[in-house]
Amino acid sequence: MDSSLFSLKNSFGGFNDEELLRVQKIIEDLELTESIVSKEWVTFALQKKIAEDYSKHLDPFKVFLKKNIKKLKVQKTTEQIKEVAEEDPKMFENVEIEDIIFDTDSLVDESEIPKIKDEPSSSVDVSTARNKNNHNNNNNNNPSLPNKSMFKPTKQEMTNDNIKKVVIADDIGDFDFTTANQPIKQSNPTQLLNYKERKNIGGISYSMNNNEELKTDLSLREKKSCDLKGAGEEFYPIKYHRDTLEQRTKILKESVQSNNYTFPVSLDCQDDESIVRSVGRVWMYDQETILSKRFYLLGNERDSSSSGGSSGSASIFSLENNIPDYSMFSGQVVMAESKKIAGSHFYYTNKLYTPNPLPFFSQRKECGDINVMIASGPFDLQKSTPDYTPLDDLCNVVSNKKPHILFLMGPFIDESNVHIKKYSETFSELFNNLMKKLNDNIPSTTKVLIVPSLNDVDHEYIFPQPPYVPSVNLNSNILFVPNPFTLIINESFTIGITSSDIYNNLVSKAHFKNKHTPEDIFNMIINQNNYYPMHPAQAPISMRYLQHLNFPGFTPDILVVPKNSPIAAISNDVLCLGVPPIVGNKSTFGSYAELTVTKSKQSLAFDNNIPVSKRTIVNFKNI
């Protein structure tokens, strides 16, 4: 066999010699490279669902290439320049490769090259345009990198032709020419609210299960004491170490196999030998391709050397357009039911299965009604001196209502507070003073659980987070727990809580075929049996402690996460709560959650079969 055909046989698996000769002729006629044509064949084969009889599809494939010839020529030029640059890096030391490509007029029409319109400098406010990618693509998993831009321009207002513009008097840095001529939208400044002037104090902003039957039963029942027990293994004190990319990939792959996920169907499909079922973590094919169109399954045991995209032998999956519904995010463990394209590592997938949720806590005992309050930080008004008036008011509410349990989620000293550098107290002193305030103003009958946050400036920036360790003596009812945390109350029901921003992260990064609801977002978390199933994570996850993000062998009856606005939803019989901050952005003021977990109907005595989600009264009340 000719050496060139032997090379083609590796790129076009399943092709016979005659078909390979035709492919070679296409490459020569269109003056493209083998790598480009092989990649385009994969795309073409997936679109047309070609699994055999390649010969009859080669002429349409050549037409397909001709339609995209300009783009492919640019790709070829880019490959050639990069090869030269690798051999002699100094040749293009001060030149951008994209600039060289744009100079090749024979390959690209002038009409396709982005241009900057010649306009007077007064008509365009170029100083506000910056290259967003360079500021938004920080590695959030590295705590040593700043998560906020250090660019602090000064602003000066100018008027030109009665149009108010904003000019930033600073170096424009990496200027984004593609946005230079876009008009600037001048939004009205948000008026800061005065805390004392807030309205509807104590009013209900959101409720669930607030029906008369539960209220009547609640008034007849006697409150009992509350016994608390944490679930899961301790993982602190934390040991810091650096995770290499290879280590992170290996741990993520192994976690798929070690967790023993159960699915609605068997991994082996005996009814149809052409169908292949594969289990793994959804992983992006590249930054440009939509997740549903092409992805890897990290940890897929059917791959002999799966490496999450770094190896050409890793299987590539693509969802068919006729799938009625799906929801996907990177890091999600799924089972893909697919058909393989013969002679390749590509599969087109017509069904996706997610793991079955874990069962609920089983060893339940009879318990009286339990009252729980939940509040999320920040709790300060972000002034030049510490002002925790909202926390004082919350303590007064707790003192009057005397709930069994109070959850306080951080941040307690918020890193976004621009005034904290001006405070005379150290962060440790400020936190200890806050704990003393809770200790002195909250009844000893109320168990207070302090949950740290990644936005706490005085706590460890690693996830999962260990609990706070204050250097002050406190009553035994003030308890410090890790983030995330699962609590067993009176061996009757369970609450799982995390202050990580997993809800908003999933909303922004997940892919849905149809419109999604809050129940869909919560369902993603529950089906993954994990408090933070997204990878790559927007939280600084330590791979050494990855397993401590898993649910502790059961699904919590109540799942609590932070959210910008209050929400209560039932997903898979789990009561899911999104708790807003007490003090939000622009000094807006939020609400806290009040829960009453009741027994079943009095006539039925205690019935374990009625989910906690259906016998819990939920009220969000304004601070």
UniProtKB/Swiss-Prot annotation:
Protein name: DNA polymerase alpha subunit B
Protein purpose: May play an essential role at the early stage of chromosomal DNA replication by coupling the polymerase alpha/primase complex to the cellular replication machinery.
Subunit annotation: DNA polymerase alpha:primase is a four subunit enzyme complex, which is assembled throughout the cell cycle, and consists of the two DNA polymerase subunits A and B, and the DNA primase large and small subunits. Subunit B binds to subunit A.
Keyword hit for Nucleus: yes
Composition bias type Polar residues, residue spans: 121-130
Major localisation: nucleus
Family: Belongs to the DNA polymerase alpha subunit B family.
Entry keyword set: DNA replication, Nucleus, Phosphoprotein
Subcellular location: Nucleus
Domain of life per record: Eukaryota
Gene3D superfamilies with a match to the protein in the record: 3.60.21.60
Segments for region (Disordered): 113-151
Biological processes, Gene Ontology terms: DNA replication initiation
Record GO cellular component, one term: alpha DNA polymerase:primase complex
MF annotations from Gene Ontology: DNA binding
Keyword Iron applies: no
Originating organism: Dictyostelium discoideum
